[in-house]
């Protein structure tokens, strides 16, 4: 059927105000209000029922989490509004291949639970840079990696999530983009700054349920509207806009026609927009950084009761990662069928009219579907879903970023900072992070032909591979030492950042107006660039390590895969830093004893709300401290549960292979 019957003039020329009017009904507003009340209630319950008055309680939820909130939180931390907007947008523009990004994670979560987390737990660490400090000694890698991780959070995660959430609110409520951002962040910051990791994980679990429920309903509506799966395939290939020329310029056919390989995940290695070797190897490298070495993800696993709960949480997350292809990518493609003129626009003036940016409007595919297709009440639910995904991602990132700053950077500046000072510093840092992220939003708006998901993946391809290389070699190659790891990170970063800056300087261009960036720099697909950068970093690390002094095994017990089960006592390379930490804790005790004066009611309420009332239990003896440390670094599992999670892990890998093969 010709696509023109699927783009009614009324919707094609709809202004945001009409969409805004649609939300103005009792059912939608009630659902949104109820949603916010429930989320705040869960956040407040977690806030008052968990220990947030210590660094371990605020940042690691006291290592008491069971598998299902961990699985839900892993999924919710990963799936932000950037996925709803970005995956659906790239799906509308180029077909199902972008779903391969999600399915790749099925393999990586197994690696995370079975290989990486056991090492991190045995090392007894809270942050990823802290692991590298124990593994290599010295402080420069730890500080460098903390700063780089924070830069990545700002450039990719926070900016993209804020931008995509604001697109949705702008379309649905008619609010100014930056006012929408401000309101969102105010609510998000409130319970992250006050609540700590337990509040984040419990609200994530609630929001995962809402997110899946809402997107299942929308997918059902979308497929019903388009006439089922086979009609969807036919109609998508015919979803071509009618306006394809302006002035004396006619748009090239490939700019507005759906790709011939739209329904294949694996695409041509040279001409494909997502070449299959890049999707298999390049994406796995980026995913290794994201899933196995990134603070946001690993922190959830480190909060688990024991290893079986870690693995079960990873499996649960893996199964849920099957869904975005059907709940986000395909609805985005259906949005192109139903609202072709708007979503598939190619003429710059038309695009600017519909979504305020000249490079393309595919980013509004999912929000448009929600606003135009859903009945009253359900539309409010879907707006709540978008807010849920945005806020769950932001809360996760804010909590993890403040952990990195507090534990890895602030403690270097203020070596004798009290626990209370660390808690306040972490919370204040979140406010700085928010400000910088908002300033970056306009750049996100115009990058990668207006395709948000491509922007996120390209930035991680330029900055992530060196980190992945260092962690991989740190765990599997005990010969690697500090000079090798440090210079590998620095050289890898310089190569990646030079590509990133060049691309931003020239602009990524669009199908209509290609970028003038030199082919030798920007002509290499970002997934291929990730492979090249990863290999160069590994060569540099190994070469420098082999020419410099190795680290003795006594410093590496339980920090490398080959020495993971050793029972000998490890002499940490950062033992001096540990002494400073102990001295700080002793000073803290003296400090708290000295300041036991009676506080007023207002001060007590303030401390309780912000989690600054350190719950003081009886002081532990040295033997009790040693037993506690043993519990925190224990990776043992009951035989039955180990078998159950192992069998499920194998099934998950088989499902991943089947999905890739079926849609190849």
Curated annotation (Swiss-Prot):
Reactions the enzyme catalyzes: D-glucose(out) + 2 Na(+)(out) = D-glucose(in) + 2 Na(+)(in); D-galactose(out) + 2 Na(+)(out) = D-galactose(in) + 2 Na(+)(in)
Keywords: Cell membrane, Disulfide bond, Glycoprotein, Ion transport, Membrane, Sodium, Sodium transport, Sugar transport, Symport, Transmembrane, Transmembrane helix, Transport
Membrane-topology annotation of the record: Multi-pass membrane protein
Pfam families from the UniProt entry: SSF (PF00474)
Residues involved in D-glucose binding: 457
Transmembrane residue ranges: 25-47, 67-90, 96-117, 140-169, 177-193, 203-221, 276-295, 310-331, 376-406, 423-444, 452-477, 482-504, 526-547, 645-662
A GO BP entry: transepithelial water transport
SS bond list: 255-511, 255-610, 345-351, 355-361, 517-522
Glycosylation sites: 248
Main location: membrane
Activity regulation summary: Enhanced by the interaction with PDZK1IP1/MAP17; but unlike SLC5A2/SGLT2, PDZK1IP1 is not essential for SLC5A1 transporter activity. Possibly modulated by cholesterol binding.
Membership in a protein family: Belongs to the sodium:solute symporter (SSF) (TC 2.A.21) family.
Name the record gives this protein: Sodium/glucose cotransporter 1
This protein's encoding gene: SLC5A1
